[in-house]
Amino acid sequence: MAYKITSLAGDGIGPEIMASGIKILEAIAAKYNHTFEIESHPFGGAGIDAAGDPIPPETLKACQNADAILLGAIGGPKWDNAPKRPEDGLLALRKALGLFANIRPIQVPSSITHLSPLKKEIVENTDFVVVRELTGGLYFGEPKHWDDVAAVDSLTYTRVEIERIIEKAFEIASTRNKKVTSVDKANVLASSKLWRKIAEEVASRHPDITLEHLYVDAAAMLMIQRPTTFDVIVTENLFGDILSDEASVITGSLGMLPSASHAENGPSLYEPIHGSAPDIANQNIANPMSMISSVSMMLRQSFSLFKEADAIDAATARTMQAGFLTADLGGNTSTTDFTNEVLKQIEGGE
């Protein structure tokens, strides 16, 4: 079977880490006899440079026709004053594809627990997932207005928006440790009262999965105090934006973590959580781990290639345990050397 993948390398370190991700895909294809049809297109700043638009029509069409999309990174000071910014392309892509659920796994490999800003005994064995709603809430609510006297933002959520994201969280929890933590502010916000009510309704359809509720301030505190108590966290757009970024620093480096964004139907988008890091671009020092892990997520969640994804995850773990660490992890391994070691581990693994 052939899998169609649209590659959006983007800007800054994006092309370097995308090259790593594609090499990993090629190794998996060779070892397990798969065909990955990879089509590259300009996006973000590269799209502006190539076609005057962060998401040129050809790029959007390729994304819509793909089985999955890989994104490197976008943005940079070069386009700060452009009429359309690179980030506008990502918002447009999310809207065009109907991407409503952002999935961010948080894990701390034993080889880098010493890099976490938290104590080793706190972060050891951390393994949870943040599920963030992407299409509703304060970021998209109307009316929205500001002037010198006052400003208005509107927080709106519909039953459909809430129910589908909470169902997604329960779906993920069913494959993990069967616990969902729903995060809201139901003691203050009307939208959170509806959120909590619907969470209970969804939970009643999944009796084998435990549901707990936390106010967002308590969740933010517990994520630092006892991160190992979480399995799947689900929350609305603004809270998810903040909590997922808070969770990301537990590992000690943004270069470690992947993310996925899913629609109800159609292709999903996989990308590292970090930015384009233009200050280290083209120096062969970027950590490709988050891109490689994004490839693993894609194989697992879009293509159901679980054995192949496990092979990638095991290879990256062995690579780091052997001391191959990039600069952000306190080492001096280059982007290409790290990638080559992972390739070696994939080829030599079971």
Swiss-Prot record:
Summarize the protein's role: Catalyzes the oxidation of 3-carboxy-2-hydroxy-4-methylpentanoate (3-isopropylmalate) to 3-carboxy-4-methyl-2-oxopentanoate. The product decarboxylates to 4-methyl-2 oxopentanoate.
SUPFAM superfamilies tied to this protein:
Isocitrate/Isopropylmalate dehydrogenase-like (SSF53659)
- Major subcellular location class: cytoplasm
Residue positions annotated to bind Mg(2+) are: 217, 241, 245
State the family named in the UniProt similarity comment for this chain: Belongs to the isocitrate and isopropylmalate dehydrogenases family. LeuB type 1 subfamily.
GO cellular component terms? cytosol
* Protein source organism: Listeria innocua serovar 6a (strain ATCC BAA-680 / CLIP 11262)
Q: Where does NAD(+) bind?
A: 76-87, 275-287
Q: Where is this site: Important for catalysis?
A: 139, 185
Q: What is this protein called?
A: 3-isopropylmalate dehydrogenase
Q: Extract the HAMAP family matched here.
A: LeuB_type1
